[in-house]
């Protein structure tokens, strides 16, 4: 939540730090701020850490969630690894990590999973691994992210309240029908892939809420498609 990271963002800028690191209340998830004060998307961190693991163990499996940037898939493919898409949620991730003997897994929400940590999530290992990566390359976090930010344009998660759970399901079915000319799959909510963009819309597990994540190859396409889907959800 943006208001919860205002203090660390201000401190990073004030001290001219190369990186800011924050944890949630029980420290099982980890979040990052770059040296410019910009929040770093969890799927970009997943991509960076996947690369680090695959350099050490080429051809390994990496688990990522349905909302993630193509950056993850592209980097895993670059190192001849296997990128395994999965449902959102730590219970589903831990099960899949163990079943596949995956070396690493990452969720957009800042949960990261490690084969060497019993296939479970850990909030401190991502920070240590990212600091190691920065040290080895003698660069800042913003430097590591620059190639990703130039190529992948993501919306971040956008939440929309819906009147009822029945309407949530109707909207999901409507999206699947409206975007049927793409590659549609329903691993978790509705996802659709096109040559220059893709999206996932999924329901909250606890309230009548739809969550949109979208990515495109340009900022303009991302904004256009984002607004179109939000218009449908909110109509």
Segments from the language model and where they lie:
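Short, hinge-like loop/turn segments at secondary-structure boundaries
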Residues: 1-6, 39, 79-81, 102-104
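N-terminal small/polar loop signature for handling phosphorylated ligands or for N-terminal nucleophile
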Residues: 1-33
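Well-ordered alpha-helical segments embedded in enzymatic catalytic cores
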Residues: 4-7, 45, 49
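Short glycine/threonine-rich catalytic loop with a Thr-x-Gly-x-Asp
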Residues: 23-25, 39-44, 118-121
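Short, ordered loop/turn segments at secondary-structure junctions
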Residues: 25, 36, 44-45, 67, ...
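Short Gly/Thr/Asp-enriched flexible loops that form oxyanion-binding sites at enzyme active sites
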Residues: 28-47, 72-73
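Phosphate-binding and adjacent anionic-ligand microenvironments
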Residues: 19, 55-213, 218-235
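A conserved helix-loop-strand patch within extracytoplasmic ligand-binding domains
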Residues: 48-56
């Amino acid at each position: 939540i943006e208001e919860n990271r205002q203090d660390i963002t201000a401190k990073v800028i004030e001290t001219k730090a190369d990186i800011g690191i924050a944890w949630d209340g029980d420290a099982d998830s980890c979040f990052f701020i770059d040296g410019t004060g910009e929040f770093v998307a969890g799927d970009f961190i997943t991509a960076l850490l996947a690369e680090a693991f695959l350099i050490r163990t080429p051809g390994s499996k990496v688990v990522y969630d349905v909302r993630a940037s193509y950056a993850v898939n592209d980097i895993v493919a670059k190192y001849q690894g296997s990128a395994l898409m999965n449902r959102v949620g730590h219970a589903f991730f831990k099960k899949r990590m163990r079943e596949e003997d995956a070396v690493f897994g990452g969720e957009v929400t800042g949960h990261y999973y490690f084969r060497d940590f019993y296939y479970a999530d850990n909030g401190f290992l991502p920070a240590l691994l990212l600091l190691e990566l920065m040290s080895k390359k003698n660069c800042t976090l913003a430097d590591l992210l620059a190639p990703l930010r130039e190529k992948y344009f993501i919306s971040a998660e956008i939440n929309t309240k819906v009147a009822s759970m029945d309407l949530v399901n109707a909207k999901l079915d409507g999206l699947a029908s409206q975007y049927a000319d793409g590659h549609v799959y329903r691993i978790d909510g509705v996802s659709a892939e096109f040559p220059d963009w893709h999206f996932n819309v999924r329901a909250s597990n606890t309230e009548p809420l739809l969550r949109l994540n979208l990515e495109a190859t340009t900022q303009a396409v991302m904004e256009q498609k984002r607004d179109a889907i939000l218009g449908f959800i909110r109509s």
